[in-house]
Amino acid sequence: MNESLLTQFGNSLTRVEKALENLKNGKGVLLVDDENRENEGDLIFPAETITVPQMAMLIRECSGIVCLCLTDEKVKKLGLTQMVSNNTCTYETAFTISIEAKEGVTTGVSAADRVTTILTAVKDDCKPEDLCHPGHVFPLRARAGGVLTRPGHTEGTVDLMRLAGYNPAGILCELTNPDGTMARLPQIINFAKKHNLTILSIEDIIKYKEIVT
């Protein structure tokens, strides 16, 4: 990670604190990983406060593959099996089967329908029978221990939601450029400035958890 590019947003602890404040206010933040890993930035929002305009932004500005990051406990409670039994993905991204709300949606693909699906899934009393499969929202199972166990966007998202006082469930989608290529750090920073978003790295969260928690 080119730390010098991020210093304009403060030091590691300041960036995390700014991100947590924005999340507490229902705003999104941009989370980047190491250049030697995926080298991508994800736009993330708290799952329990996601709005239709925010979902539309995720669909419009990002890859369109909107993911719901959940704890292993929640994944089991919802009866979500892993998408594949043998995960050969380079970074072992833990996709479960996709989901749709059983009620309150049409085709499931619109911004409003995806919000309905997410708000249904993150309810404390949501049961497996409240969801159907396949769907247009893609749950990801975070590893226990968060970024200290796996330095991924999934774990970073769940960690940030916990630290912000939410239930440990968040939305992420990878930021892309207008031509469809993946946004790298310079483009991610420009996007953050344009939309007045906080940016932080997974390494920032690791440092924060080691020092503060």
Curated annotation (Swiss-Prot):
The keyword Disulfide bond does not apply. It catalyses: D-ribulose 5-phosphate = (2S)-2-hydroxy-3-oxobutyl phosphate + formate + H(+). Mg(2+) 1 binds at E38. D-ribulose 5-phosphate binds at R37, E38, D42, R150, P151, G152, H153, T154, E174. GO terms for molecular function: 3,4-dihydroxy-2-butanone-4-phosphate synthase activity; magnesium ion binding; manganese ion binding. It is an enzyme of class 4 (lyase). Coiled coil: none annotated. The keyword Lyase applies. Mg(2+) 2 binds at E38, H153. One of its GO terms (cellular component) is cytosol. Binds 2 divalent metal cations per subunit. Magnesium or manganese. Its cofactor is Mg(2+); Mn(2+). Disulfide bonds: none annotated. One of its GO terms (biological process) is riboflavin biosynthetic process. Keywords: Lyase, Magnesium, Manganese, Metal-binding, Riboflavin biosynthesis. Its EC number is 4.1.99.12. Gene3D superfamilies: DHBP synthase. The record marks H136, E174 as: Essential for catalytic activity. Pathway: Cofactor biosynthesis; riboflavin biosynthesis; 2-hydroxy-3-oxobutyl phosphate from D-ribulose 5-phosphate: step 1/1. Homodimer. Belongs to the DHBP synthase family. HAMAP family: RibB. This is 3,4-dihydroxy-2-butanone 4-phosphate synthase.
